[in-house]
Amino acid sequence: MSTTTEILAHHWAFGLFLIIAVGLCVFMLTGGFLLGGRAKGRAKNVPYESGIDSVGSARLRLSAKFYLVAMFFVIFDVEALYLYAWAVSIKESGWIGFIEATIFILVLLAGLIYLVRVGALDWTPVRSKRQVVKSDIINTTNNHPQ
């Protein structure tokens, strides 16, 4: 038997699964396109407000910093899930598991320190931070004659 025939003999079920999955996706997308209604009015892209006329724009612009902090949160949150799984199995893992978790926490801490040092968690860019000069400091001593 040739190599190609052996590969097909071992993986025919996976190939059939891929063909059926792609065919089902194409069928559903084509069916939705052919059977779906077409809205041709001006109000097609206006959000539904329960019969009340819309006021203003429905779009909310968020700073790119929000998405950056959200990504950092997701990354560190997933790593916290790994620590939770370690905490559940702490009796089985013993001292070796404790040392591995300590190294993992130190790597997380190094990543957090790096993010702080780079300024990735600062909300305002450096150019917009106001520099404190001597004239901005309020004089707390009373120089008025009494």
From Swiss-Prot:
The keyword Transport applies. NDH-1 shuttles electrons from NADH, via FMN and iron-sulfur (Fe-S) centers, to quinones in the respiratory chain. The immediate electron acceptor for the enzyme in this species is believed to be ubiquinone. Couples the redox reaction to proton translocation (for every two electrons transferred, four hydrogen ions are translocated across the cytoplasmic membrane), and thus conserves the redox energy in a proton gradient. Keywords: Cell inner membrane, Cell membrane, Membrane, NAD, Quinone, Translocase, Transmembrane, Transmembrane helix, Transport, Ubiquinone. It holds the Pfam family Oxidored_q4. One of its GO terms (molecular function) is quinone binding. One of its GO terms (cellular component) is NADH dehydrogenase complex. Its EC number is 7.1.1.-. PANTHER family: NADH-QUINONE OXIDOREDUCTASE SUBUNIT A, NADH-UBIQUINONE OXIDOREDUCTASE CHAIN 3. The chain crosses the membrane at residues 14-34, 68-88, 96-116. NDH-1 is composed of 13 different subunits. Subunits NuoA, H, J, K, L, M, N constitute the membrane sector of the complex. It is an enzyme of class 7 (translocase). It comes from the Bacteria. It is found in: Cell inner membrane. It is a multi-pass membrane protein. It catalyses: a quinone + NADH + 5 H(+)(in) = a quinol + NAD(+) + 4 H(+)(out). HAMAP family: NDH1_NuoA (MF_01394). The keyword Transmembrane applies. Gene3D superfamilies: NADH:ubiquinone/plastoquinone oxidoreductase, chain 3. This is NADH-quinone oxidoreductase subunit A. Its main location: membrane. Belongs to the complex I subunit 3 family.
